[in-house]
């Protein structure tokens, strides 16, 4: 197992208790005065879809959903990686641990997705499983296990090269009516 820690020691403090209450924080977009989006996942036989791709002129735009912030961030990571490589071609042969901390949930989500792109580039690895745990105690802490393998050009064909996660229209919402969490992301490809 690979342990990658950026500015935080991996300890018991990073593993959340089951009864943690999450609150919705003002989005980066709201703080910047940008127009908000609605957090409504399209039903798929009355089941929540994990993510959907939206039209964008030059880049890749998606929304990922979850019943919890952890599920939303796992689904966002899956949507990010699906834009790069077919996850069906990726075997879980290795795991990487990522630990991050940020004052706001959106800041943490941005770091999380950026870290996945960083790992892809520096570890020459592709990923297909993302297990995220969160804890909020003043700041937000993320401990995640990512499963995947080293790039094998015979099996992995790449769809898009993701250069970066953009801050443009990046935001997280919680739909209070159905308790659904939603993140909107634009990838610079």
What is the meaning of each model-derived region?
Residues 29-32, 41-42:
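Ala/Thr-enriched low-complexity intrinsically disordered regions
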């Amino acid at each position: 197992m690979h342990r990658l820690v950026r500015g935080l020691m991996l300890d018991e403090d990073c593993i959340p208790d089951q009864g943690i209450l999450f609150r919705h924080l003002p989005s980066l977009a709201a703080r910047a005065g940008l127009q908000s989006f609605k957090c409504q996942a399209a039903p798929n036989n009355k089941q929540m879809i994990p993510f959907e791709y939206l039209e964008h002129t030059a880049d890749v735009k998606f929304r990922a959903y979850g019943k919890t912030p952890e599920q939303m961030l796992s689904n966002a990571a899956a949507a990010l990686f699906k834009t790069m490589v077919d996850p069906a071609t990726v075997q879980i042969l290795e795991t990487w641990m990522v630990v991050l901390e940020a004052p706001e949930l959106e800041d943490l989500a941005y770091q999380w997705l950026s870290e996945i792109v960083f790992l892809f580039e520096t570890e020459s690895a592709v990923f297909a499983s993302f297990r995220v745990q969160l804890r909020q105690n003043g700041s937000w802490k993320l401990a995640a296990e990512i499963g995947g393998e080293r790039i094998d050009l015979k099996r992995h064909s790449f769809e898009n090269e993701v250069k970066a996660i953009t801050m443009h229209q990046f935001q997280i919402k919680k739909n209070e009516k159905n308790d659904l969490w939603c993140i909107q992301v634009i990838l610079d490809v």
